[in-house]
Amino acid sequence: MPRSMAAVDAQMLWMSAKVPNDQFLLFAFDGSPTRVPDAVDEMRRRAQSCPELGLGALDNIKWRYPRWQSGEIGADQFVTHPGARGWPDCLDAVTALAADQLDLRRMSWRAHVFPEVHGMPAAATGTVVVIQIGHALGDGKRSAALAGALLGRRGAIPPVAAQRGWLPARTVAAWRAHRQLLRDIEAGAVPPPAPPRPLLSINDSPRGNPVVRTLVVRREQLSVPTVTIGALTAISDALGGYLAGRGEDPSLLSAEVPMAGAGNGHAHNDFRNVGVGLHVAVDRAQRARLIAEELAAQRRRGEHPAMRAASAAFAATPAALLRWGTGKFDPEGRVAAVSGNTVVSSVNRGAADLSFGGASVVFTAGYPALSPMMSLTHGVHGIGEHVAVSVHADSVNVDVDDYVGRLRVAIGR
């Protein structure tokens, strides 16, 4: 039976018509199957046994929210890209996939198989599988779980029950909780929101072809004190130096970091973006401490009742009103300041227990989408003992090779 989408998921669906938001989850395996069609058939059988992978969008009534409905897993959801290729050519092919965004009314995900890739990091020759997922179907954490189900991870993925309620009551509750939040901020019990940051060249609108790069390291190279903090510290070092070398002032450099929500099971997307200063002017040890403190502060802010009340009020927004508001969004609009100059999305994709045609997973990567205000984004993705730090950049606004070279040095310190 169809179930209604949560407001935040519907907004993701409608926004995809303005700003493409498909996610591309890359998994690299340490060998190539003898028979690729058999490995693809196995993946299809796994999909058929997971109800959440059978969902598609039904959006046929303007005044109500779209619904999730179950459907068949089609053969066209599995695309094999034949032939041998090198790792750089594979990344170029992955980048090109973004030109064909999903229509969630037809399919909410698609699997791309590159069966023979040479010169991969951490493996000489292997297979690359890219799972393309519409953002309405899941945020970074849920999409990783769905991809895991396709690639052999055991365990059910729980369905989501959309939260509804009476908008006036929830609005009043949110207003009262917000007043308490302001009092708590003034008393120093809760941190204020991160301040807006001035624009830099990496905040120019993309003008060229997108380019992706991936650095793969052992987990212990970044996990001081955590992988996310280690990656942010290295990115601060590399990006601060890159910008300063071009005559820009990186002193207020900041990252926009998606932070997982409370996990209340009411939406496929449960996260919020927070601004985190990168503190380029201090030494690495102090920088790591300051970044850790800011992340902890934003986590405390997210746990305040006002945040939950605001989410509940948003969930009760009438569908027609939210659809109208999303339709008014101007993707070409510019703002004078940003919460973060670059995106750093960090997701732990679990144990190295995935397989494709008998080959074991070696590493996983992801490439957060560029946007009209963002010409450089980062993905930090771990599986097992390997972490991939990936860069997605506009080829005109960013000297990708220079920046990635700096990032490689910063990670190795």
Predicted regions and their residues:
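Soluble acyl-CoA-dependent acyltransferase catalytic core bearing the H(X)4D motif
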Residues: 1-3, 26-38, 44-48, 55-372, ...
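Generic N-terminal amphipathic, Lys/Arg-enriched alpha-helix
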Residues: 20-26
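Extended, hydrophobic beta-loop-alpha segments that form or line the acyl/peptidyl-thioester binding
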Residues: 373-413
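N-terminal alpha-helical "arm" segments
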Residues: 1-18
